[in-house]
Amino acid sequence: MAEKKEKVKPTEQQKARLENTYKDKVVPALMERFKYKNIMMVPRLTKISVNIGVGEAAAEPKLLETAIQELSQITGQKPQIRKARKAISNFKLREGQAIGCRVTMRKKYMYEFLERFVTLAVPRIRDFRGLSTTSFDGRGNYSVGVREQIIFPEIDIDKVPRIQGMDISFVTTAKTDEEAFALLSELGMPFRKKNN
């Protein structure tokens, strides 16, 4: 008989710092602000998706390999190759052709990435004045475009063949943009100040 393995819960030290911050500070702050009756009503981050689109991969397949390598360095996970859903002749694109890569992070990896993004990567963005507050989708999710992959400290600038951007989507359980904005702000996202 095969023995059943027990799931080992991570200790408090093994959990990401932002995960503890969420439980200790963010949840009480949001419960007070939005007057939630139950702790399960408090919005939470469910996943972060990082996508790199490489349209030129048709002409130069090496660009896609570089994007995959860089995305795995940034996120610590193996990227999933994204393929074209339909052919577009103007872009010389065939159906099923590899045109990008994506990583979806959840739980511990998600909080670790968010912490690195907020504390290390965002301050390295040139002429940074805060993240846009208009990039919410109306259902509590937030997307941000990054123009350069070199803002992440994991990327060695000398080994980068070309500057490449990426899309980062933060998916939450929030029902409104206001709740999602409050959640991400409490987690440390540096949003642009609204001018009155």
Swiss-Prot record:
Part of the 50S ribosomal subunit; part of the 5S rRNA/L5/L18/L25 subcomplex. Contacts the 5S rRNA and the P site tRNA. Forms a bridge to the 30S subunit in the 70S ribosome. GO terms for cellular component: ribonucleoprotein complex; ribosome. Transmembrane segments: none annotated. It comes from the Bacteria. It comes from Chlorobium phaeobacteroides (strain BS1). This is Large ribosomal subunit protein uL5. One of its GO terms (biological process) is translation. This is one of the proteins that bind and probably mediate the attachment of the 5S RNA into the large ribosomal subunit, where it forms part of the central protuberance. In the 70S ribosome it contacts protein S13 of the 30S subunit (bridge B1b), connecting the 2 subunits; this bridge is implicated in subunit movement. Contacts the P site tRNA; the 5S rRNA and some of its associated proteins might help stabilize positioning of ribosome-bound tRNAs. Belongs to the universal ribosomal protein uL5 family. Keywords: Ribonucleoprotein, Ribosomal protein, RNA-binding, rRNA-binding, tRNA-binding. NCBIfam families: PRK00010.1. The gene is rplE. HAMAP family: Ribosomal_uL5_B. The keyword GTP-binding does not apply. SUPFAM superfamilies: RL5-like. GO terms for molecular function: rRNA binding; structural constituent of ribosome; tRNA binding. The keyword Ribosomal protein applies.
